[in-house]
């Protein structure tokens, strides 16, 4: 069976870490991420409550949520990312992580809240996005909140048609997802910059109405839509606060 296109993130993690970088994604020291999570936890009374993170990456949110007193469970399809996050979270007894395909693997337990940090936009086909969002919705207890943080966003010009495959998306965008490109990654240990060649990975941005329609079709209630300032993590993004 052909592996899913979003396994490109596993290949990227492997390449970046083998080049000597310690961190690719968010850091627990990201002030915007920390302050957003702190406010979200406090407003929803999530201390000592269970939170699942989809596409948890290297565990930055896990550290922050653990420090805020939450019971954390992170999942990601990348074994390399899970290895990194497990090491980062080893001193937090209420934090666990596991390899899981958030599109295909169902979540058996019900959680008090959920978070997705730059995860949804990794999915480009309509079917994968719908399957994942339904999975996330069904993992939540009634009236539980979910935060989609820094999802790729454009005010206009996004593709509103149906996308059925990664090949179809590549034709629509004209982007090259095969040729490695030079990227610079700041090493978390000593602050030096590591240069690495990695291909562009597929990502699908939506406008405000596109996101709202997508969430409401699953059953989520939209509480807040926030356009984020540009960051080194992603230039154009939005954070969407929803509730089951």
For every predicted segment, state its role.
Residues 1-46, 57-70, 75-93, 99-104, ...:
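Class I (Rossmann-like) S-adenosyl-L-methionine-dependent methyltransferase catalytic domain
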Residues 115:
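A conserved beta-strand element that flanks and buttresses the S-adenosyl-L-methionine
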Residues 111-112:
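Local beta-strand N-terminus motif with an aromatic residue
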Residues 118-122:
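Short catalytic micro-motifs in class I SAM-dependent methyltransferases
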Residues 130-142:
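A short glycine-rich, Lys/Arg-flanked "PGG" loop and its adjoining helix->strand segment in the class I
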Residues 125-127:
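Conserved catalytic-core motifs of eukaryotic protein kinase domains, centered on the activation segment
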Residues 54:
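Conserved beta-strand/loop positions that form the S-adenosyl-L-methionine
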């Amino acid at each position: 069976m052909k592996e899913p296109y979003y396994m490109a993130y596993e290949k990227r993690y492997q390449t970046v870490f083998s080049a000597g970088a310690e961190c690719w994604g968010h850091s627990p020291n990201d002030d915007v991420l920390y302050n957003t999570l702190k406010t979200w936890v406090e407003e929803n009374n999530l201390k000592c409550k269970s939170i699942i993170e989809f596409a948890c990456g290297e565990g930055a949110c896990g550290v922050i949520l653990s420090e805020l007193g939450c019971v954390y469970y992170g999942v990601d399809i990348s074994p390399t990312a899970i290895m990194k996050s497990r090491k980062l979270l080893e001193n937090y007894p209420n934090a666990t992580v596991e390899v899981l395909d958030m599109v295909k693997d169902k979540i058996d337990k019900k959680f008090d809240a959920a978070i997705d940090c730059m995860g949804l936009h990794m999915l480009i086909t309509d079917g994968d996005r719908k399957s994942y969002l339904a999975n996330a919705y069904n993992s939540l207890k009634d009236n539980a909140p979910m935060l989609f943080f820094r999802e790729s966003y454009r005010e206009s010009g996004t593709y509103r048609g149906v996308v059925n495959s990664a090949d179809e998306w590549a034709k629509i965008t004209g982007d090259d997802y095969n040729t490695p490109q030079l990227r610079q990654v700041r090493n978390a240990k000593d602050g030096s910059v590591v240069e690495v060649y990695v291909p562009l990975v597929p990502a699908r941005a939506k406008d405000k109405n596109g996101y709202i329609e997508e969430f409401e079709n699953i059953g989520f209630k939209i509480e807040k839509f926030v356009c984020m300032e540009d960051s080194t993590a992603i230039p154009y993004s939005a954070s969407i606060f929803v509730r089951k």
